[in-house]
Every structure is written in structure tokens, then in C-alpha cells.
Amino acid sequence: MATIALFCEGASEIKILTYIIAKYLGDDISVNALQPEMSFGRQTSPGGWYEVLRHCNNEDFNNALATNDYLIIQIDTDSCSQIGFDVNEYDENGHRVNDELLYNRVVTRLLRDLSPELLDEYCGRILFAVCINETECWLLPFYYEKENPDKCAATNNCIHHLNRKLSRDRLGIPEKDKNS
């Protein structure tokens, strides 16, 4: 059985990635959420982009990949320009860069504090789930694909679009504590 470790921003991202992994790779996969820590489906340690970056170091990578076949690092880009994240989402002319360039800048940032030796050792075992803006954007195609295909391409205010759709079915995601 293959094993996949996760470094994610929060419990909702872990749930989404676990679902996607199971959907595409089947039941012969074991997912181990290492960041944030989880107990009985609830988040028990701090989350957010800062915690993901804090785990992007040689020791945490070694620990994760010593006992797992792969490591997926999930991070949203909605806070990438904040101090500490330090990824510029604009070019030298002040225009927002395209999604591919933003993705590459974020991956470079995630790997910044790792030694070249470690990167060589684990080449091919580190995967990235960089969410352009918010993870909730990944869910829009599941709900809007048939009735409003333009919503599927949204990258801003995704939680609001998703909640609007879910509220029609009397569901919703809490905006202040989406990890509950």
C-alpha cells in the first residue's frame, strides 16, 4: 500500500485532498495528515500558510518521507504577498502574473529552506497542491459544471460562490471557521 503524507493549511484542505486522492488513486492508498495534526476528523494544531512554510525544512521533510512514499504540500496563494510568505504575484509592470508563473514562484518558495542534497534524495516524491487563491476554488466545478460553466474558472471569492450554491441546498461552509 502506498502512503502519502500531507502538509496542508487546514482540516478542510486535508479533507478535500484526501477525497481527491481516493477518487483518483483508489483504496490502496493511505493518507497521513502531518500538518495540521488531526484527531477524530478535527484539527488539533495550528493551520494556515505560516504553519505550512514552517514545516518546509529538512527535518520535517526527512521525517515525512522516511515513513511515507510521497509528500503533498498544499498551500493557497491568497496570502502569498504577506511578509513571511514573500511571493510576489505581480510582474515588474504591476500586472498580476499568470497562474503558471505564480505556481512556480510558490513552489520555489516552498523549497527555499531545503538543502540541495535533500531535494536530490527525494526528487519525484514531493508533490505540490498550490491552490490559486483558495482551495474552495477547486470545488466549484463539482457544483457549477452544468448550470454555469463560467463559475468553474473563478479564482476570486470562491467560498462566496460555493456558499451561494450550497445555500440553495441548505448547506454551507462557515466563513470564519471553515475547518469545523
Q: What are these regions, as identified by a protein language model?
A:
Residues E9-G10:
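Helix N-cap/beta->alpha junction signal
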Residues R42-P46:
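Start-of-domain marker
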Residues M1-A5:
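Extreme N-terminal starter segment of soluble prokaryotic enzymes
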Residues I14-P36, F40, Y50-S180:
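C-terminal accessory helical subdomains adjacent to catalytic cores in phosphodiester-
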